[in-house]
């Protein structure tokens, strides 16, 4: 296939840290690739967004130092395996900078995915706890958007549609 695979678990568990991302960057050094295909949840997606703007010699600190001038180095395709966060369509990655003692976002227009692919079948095997927390998150976002003082007819339409999709899933899981 001519592709390189990288499993986040090899580099640590939980939320992404600078140490984890730097280890992945070290692992990728010397490998030539044009695109990143991220299949996973929030940690995988956040790491992929960082990798898409990283040059071959970068460390996490380098990216934060030049955040205002980041450029896309690799095409980014995101396939989320959880529902509700919307991370596949945002341009922010939250990294716990353990070496600095802060948890802060890395934000750049260059971090938007080139494509986001939603595959409902990937959600069918979600453990109940993951489904529950991520779908509640999505439901809260939908209600929040609907009730916002800045809501408009279009945003309310999307909010209503989101709830129309989420609530039957709950009925299916719970009943």
What are these regions (language model features)?
Residues 56-153:
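A glycine/threonine-rich phosphate-anchoring loop and its flanking beta-alpha core
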Residues 31-42, 86, 90-92, 133-134, ...:
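A broadly tuned preference for mixed-charge, low-complexity surface segments
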Residues 1-59, 68, 172-175:
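N-terminal small/polar loop signature for handling phosphorylated ligands or for N-terminal nucleophile
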Residues 145-175:
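Active-site segments that bind and position negatively charged phosphate/pyrophosphate groups
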Residues 20-24, 29-32, 47, 135-138, ...:
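General structural feature for long, well-ordered alpha-helical segments within catalytic domains
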């Amino acid at each position: 296939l001519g592709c390189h695979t990288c499993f986040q678990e090899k580099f640590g568990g939980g939320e992404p840290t600078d140490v984890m991302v730097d280890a992945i960057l070290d692992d990728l050094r010397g490998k030539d690739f044009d695109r990143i295909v991220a299949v996973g949840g929030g940690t995988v997606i956040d790491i992929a967004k960082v990798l898409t703007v990283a040059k071959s010699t970068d460390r996490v600190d380098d990216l934060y130092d030049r955040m205002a001038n980041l450029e896309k180095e690799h095409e980014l395709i995101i396939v989320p395996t959880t529902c509700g966060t919307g991370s596949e369509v945002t341009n922010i990655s939250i990294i716990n900078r353990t070496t600095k003692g802060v948890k802060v976002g890395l934000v750049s227009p260059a971090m938007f995915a080139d494509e986001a692919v939603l595959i409902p079948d990937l959600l069918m095997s979600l453990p109940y706890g993951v489904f529950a927390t991520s779908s509640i998150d999505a439901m809260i976002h939908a209600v929040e958007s609907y009730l916002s003082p800045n809501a408009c007819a279009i945003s309310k339409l999307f909010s209503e549609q989101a709830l129309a999709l989420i609530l039957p899933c709950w009925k299916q899981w719970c009943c």
